[in-house]
């Protein structure tokens, strides 16, 4: 399964509610992900631009997006961003594949301005 990192902010109303009645939100997120075949790897309260960070596994992007939308539909979340995370093994494979593709790719403008293709690919 693919690993995703999501970050977001709580609304002021959500912060007021959780301050009045603290609760472990990781349980709700874990249940939401499990309902679609995903898994919560970690949930963290964070400092800075975002209030929380979630690391999760999901079968595919559509499935992950459905969980984000379901959580956001409650109105307590905002400014959500999600990133796909690749393992070290997947990264090595991606760079290997990129190396093969780069040999076949013609850079924009490579045939113009007298720049040989070999040099343009190194720019």
Residue ranges of predicted features:
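A compositional/biophysical signature of low hydrophobicity enriched in polar/charged and small residues
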Residues: 1-123
């Amino acid at each position: 399964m693919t690993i995703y990192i999501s970050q977001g902010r709580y609304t002021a109303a959500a912060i007021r509610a959780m301050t009045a009645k603290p609760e472990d939100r990781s349980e709700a997120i874990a249940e939401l992900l499990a309902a679609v075949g995903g898994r919560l790897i970690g949930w963290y309260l964070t400092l800075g631009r975002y209030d929380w960070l979630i690391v999760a596994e999901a079968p595919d992007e559509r499935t992950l997006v459905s969980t984000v939308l379901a959580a956001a539909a409650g109105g307590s979340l905002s400014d959500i961003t999600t990133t796909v995370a690749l393992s070290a093994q997947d990264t090595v494979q991606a760079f290997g594949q990129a190396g093969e593709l780069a040999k076949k790719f013609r850079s924009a403008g490579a045939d113009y301005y007298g720049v040989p293709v070999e040099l343009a690919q190194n720019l």
